[in-house]
Amino acid sequence: MISVAPKVNQANTSLKLDLDNLTTEQTALEIKDLDLYYGDKQALSKVNMNIPKGQVTAFIGPSGCGKSTLLRCINRMNDLVDICRIEGEILLHGQNIYDKSVDVAALRRNVGMVFQRPNPFPKSIYENVVYGLRLQGIKDKRKLDEVVEQSLRGAALWDEVKDRLHDSAFGLSGGQQQRLVIARSIAISPEVLLLDEPTSALDPISTLVIEELINDLKSKFTVVIVTHNMQQAARVSDQTAFMYMGELIEYSDTNTLFTTPNKKKTEDYITGRYG
């Protein structure tokens, strides 16, 4: 037992899955032999992992280990980098998302992403939430109103903003803006929600609210989170993947990884010997 490891939220340890042998019904994403290069530099090397449905999976590791790079692969954000080249597969519903036939815009509707810093649009709170729906051609006001309330409730923000929906989103606090961005993401009903260090720019109170929200979100979505904060990973995730220098070193249920890791590199990292 590693006594200085982060304390794991025991509420997330009730269901322990065999991550190497998930059934089709249990699997949200399959990552197979994934390599990523920026020019001649290899940033990810032979990453293999299965991400379960309806749970929270955390990617941890020191700066530059490849965790955010891997996260961005899941909705092809790395396509925006000209010198990026990817080999291997990421399967969603059994289809490789990097197949030429894949509609990338449709993929990103199905795999939403929230970044480190809140990025509300220069619009009202209401228009931020319905932005994706309007892009899909939805105009029915009753439908839009329903989605706004459902999404803001889902992001634990409704009670705070229901009387000022037509005010600028820039009038919200940082924590509220991040929850608004989450509401905007879930308004179009993605299957998977990617969170790239979603609390790194927030104060401790706002961070706690977001962490509680993450635990609620997994009842409807598969959540994958990148975090530098090991304590946060221990609090919110069901599974944790430890990455180092572009390689997946260890991947298991969060309780096992933080209390009885199998790899020396993992133990050294979570006990603070490097990082």
From Swiss-Prot:
One of its GO terms (cellular component) is plasma membrane. CDD domains: ABC_PstB_phosphate_transporter (cd03260). The keyword Nucleotide-binding applies. Its EC number is 7.3.2.1. Residues 29-270 form the ABC transporter domain. Keywords: ATP-binding, Cell inner membrane, Cell membrane, Membrane, Nucleotide-binding, Phosphate transport, Translocase, Transport. It catalyses: phosphate(out) + ATP + H2O = ADP + 2 phosphate(in) + H(+). It is a peripheral membrane protein. It is an enzyme of class 7 (translocase). ATP binds at G61, P62, S63, G64, C65, G66, K67, S68. InterPro entries: AAA+_ATPase, ABC_transporter-like_ATP-bd, ABC_transporter-like_CS, P-loop_NTPase, PstB-like. One of its GO terms (molecular function) is ATPase-coupled phosphate ion transmembrane transporter activity. One of its GO terms (biological process) is phosphate ion transmembrane transport. It is found in: Cell inner membrane. Belongs to the ABC transporter superfamily. Phosphate importer (TC 3.A.1.7) family. Part of the ABC transporter complex PstSACB involved in phosphate import. Responsible for energy coupling to the transport system. This is Phosphate import ATP-binding protein PstB. It comes from Pseudoalteromonas translucida (strain TAC 125). The gene is pstB.
